[in-house]
Structure formats: structure tokens, C-alpha cells
Regions:
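Short, surface-exposed loop/turn segments at secondary-structure junctions
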Residues: 28-29, 55-57
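Short, amphipathic alpha-helical interaction segments positioned at domain boundaries
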Residues: 65-78
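A short, conserved structural fragment
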Residues: 46-56
Length: 78
């Protein structure tokens, strides 16, 4: 897969996402985004520990690594 496509999908997840309270860990914040992107791309991002997907979920969570990488991509592309 083209590395730029994967990078830009991560950036879009970040730019369209929001911070919210964790359901599992009270007091912890998570960064969530809708998962309306190519499954192949989402699976690769998860394999690289940049996002966390859920079996029947309509959203994904960006990991700390994913947020850091998205911030780098934001500086690079925007």
C-alpha cells in the first residue's frame, strides 16, 4: 500500500476526531474518530499500533503513538 495514502488517512482520522472520557478508565482521556475509511488502511494502522479498532464499533481510537504521528503529518502536509 502506498505510504502516503496510509499517512493521509491517519491525518484525516486525527483532524476529524475528538477527545472524550474513557469508558473503561474514569479520568482518562481518549481520542476517537469515525472509521469510515478503507478497511485495508485501518487494519495497517492498527497493526502499527497507531489506532485501536473495535469489532462492531463505528469509531476508532487513536493511540498515543497515532496522535504523535498525526501531529508530525499535520506539520508536513498542512
Amino acid at each position: 500500500m502506498d505510504e502516503k495514502i496510509k499517512d493521509l488517512n491517519l491525518l484525516l482520522l486525527f483532524l476529524s476526531g475528538w477527545e472524550e472520557d474513557s469508558r473503561n478508565n474514569p479520568g482518562e482521556k481518549i481520542f476517537r474518530s469515525w472509521n469510515g475509511y478503507l478497511f485495508e488502511v485501518l487494519n495497517q494502522l492498527q497493526d502499527e499500533n497507531l489506532i485501536q479498532q473495535f469489532r462492531n464499533g463505528k469509531s476508532v481510537i487513536l493511540t498515543k503513538q497515532g496522535i504523535e504521528r498525526a501531529e508530525e503529518l499535520k506539520k508536513k502536509y498542512l
